[in-house]
Regions:
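ATP-dependent adenylation/nucleotidyltransferase module used to activate substrates
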Residues: 1-175
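Short amphipathic alpha-helical interaction/hinge segments
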Residues: 149, 206-209
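Glycine-rich nucleotide phosphate-binding loop and flanking beta-alpha elements
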Residues: 126, 205-206
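Local cysteine-cluster metal-coordination motifs and their immediate loop/turn environment
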Residues: 104, 182-203
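Short, intrinsically disordered, charge-biased short linear motifs at domain edges
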Residues: 170-173, 178-187
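Short cysteine/histidine-rich metal-coordination sites, predominantly Zn2+-binding motifs
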Residues: 187-188, 208-217
């Protein structure tokens, strides 16, 4: 295996990280996927991530950190059913420092398998509301990883400069199976169609002019 083309993908099961995974494969990377159970209500995230990894022919490790629910309870509606979900962005949607947690684990994994790149699905539409989706965040974390491992590992969000709709267009051109991806904050058989993530998903497909294959309740 060529270590310079060996990468780790933080794969949530959503469309953004799935596009990144397909893009990395197209770039010739050997992709190794990580998905996380962090106490989220939407347990289908990791289920769909496993299906997507299988479709890609890539290995996946699902890391069970469900006990994080104990610190996210009362903080975020993604982990606590007693906090109402909203159809627009609101502070309780944010899972504090989530990407830092996931990317830190990804660094450890990358060291173990000799990967030199870590990719995750942050994009331009995220930057306004999510500090851990901004370039200054992941570049700072990259520097911390160098200091903490003495390994040259790059942390990148390849599509941080474009919108979610533009990202979906990239994915459509790559043949991403969007029907396998999961965005909803709930755990129903279908996307609820009403939570902020479902609303953003619908809007992005519409803006991109791509048929939305999602089944909504």
């Amino acid at each position: 295996m060529n270590q310079t083309k060996n990468c780790v993908i933080v794969l949530s099961g959503g469309p953004d990280s799935t596009v990144v995974a397909y893009w990395a494969k197209k770039q010739g990377y050997d992709i190794n996927c990580l998905s996380f159970k962090y106490g989220q209500i939407a347990e289908k995230e990791t289920q769909q991530a496993a299906l997507i990894a299988e479709k890609l022919g890539a290995p996946i490790k699902i890391i069970d950190m469900s006990s994080l629910r104990e610190i996210f309870k009362g903080v975020t509606s993604l982990c606590d059913r007693n906090i109402s979900l909203t159809s627009q962005f609101s502070a309780p949607i944010v899972v504090p420092f989530r990407n830092a947690i996931f990317l830190s684990v990804a660094v450890s994994y990358a060291v173990g398998i000799g990967a030199t790149r870590i990719f995750y699905g942050a994009h331009g539409s995220d930057a306004a509301n999510y500090p851990d989706c901004r370039p200054d965040f992941y570049k700072s974390l990259e520097e911390t990883a160098w200091l903490g491992t003495e390994k040259t590992i790059q942390i990148q969000a390849p599509f941080c400069g474009i919108s979610k709709a533009e990202l979906l267009t990239v994915g459509a051109n790559l043949g991403v199976p969007f029907e396998l991806t999961w965005s909803c904050y709930l755990d129903g058989e279908k996307h609820c169609g009403k939570c902020e993530s479902c609303v953003n998903r619908k809007a992005a497909f519409k803006e991109a002019g791509i048929q939305d294959p999602t089944q909504y309740a």
